[in-house]
């Protein structure tokens, strides 16, 4: 499963829409909820990011992200 994680680079400031960034994670999970929990844990253990939202990508959404040219799976 591929998840898109929306985040702010620091927890010190209030979140601003203009500075929201995203990364993609491939997570092995039995269901969507378990995948979101694992994705959050991976990001929190390896970064100081302020996580805003974690989204499971559907096949169509994943194809769109790949075509946009910015798709790259992050590995920790």
Curated annotation (Swiss-Prot):
Answer whether the UniProt record assigns the keyword Kinase to this protein: no
Entry superkingdom: Bacteria
Report the coiled-coil segments: none
The enzyme class is: transferase
Question: What EC number is given for this enzyme?
Answer: 2.7.7.6
Which is one Gene Ontology cellular component term of this protein? Answer: DNA-directed RNA polymerase complex
Keyword vocabulary terms for this entry: DNA-directed RNA polymerase, Nucleotidyltransferase, Transcription, Transferase
Q: Which Gene3D superfamilies match?
A: RNAP, epsilon subunit-like (3.10.20.730)
| MF term (GO), any | DNA-directed RNA polymerase activity
- The question of whether Transcription is a record keyword is answered with yes
The record's Gene Ontology biological-process terms are:
DNA-templated transcription
**A Pfam family recorded for this sequence:** RpoY
According to its UniProt record, which reaction does this protein catalyse?
A: RNA(n) + a ribonucleoside 5'-triphosphate = RNA(n+1) + diphosphate
Chain's role: A non-essential component of RNA polymerase (RNAP).
Q: What does the record note on quaternary structure? A: RNAP is composed of a core of 2 alpha, a beta and a beta' subunit. The core is associated with a delta subunit, and at least one of epsilon or omega. When a sigma factor is associated with the core the holoenzyme is formed, which can initiate transcription.
Which HAMAP family does the UniProt record give?
RNApol_bact_RpoY
Question: What family is this protein classified in?
Answer: Belongs to the RNA polymerase subunit epsilon family.
Q: What is this protein called?
A: DNA-directed RNA polymerase subunit epsilon
């Amino acid at each position: 499963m591929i998840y898109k994680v929306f985040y702010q680079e620091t927890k010190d400031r209030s979140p601003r829409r203009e500075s929201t960034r995203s990364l993609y994670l491939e997570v092995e999970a039995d269901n969507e909820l378990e995948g979101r929990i694992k994705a959050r844990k991976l990001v929190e253990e390896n970064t100081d990011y302020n996580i805003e939202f974690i989204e499971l990508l559907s096949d169509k959404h994943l194809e769109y992200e790949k075509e946009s040219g910015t798709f790259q799976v992050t590995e920790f």
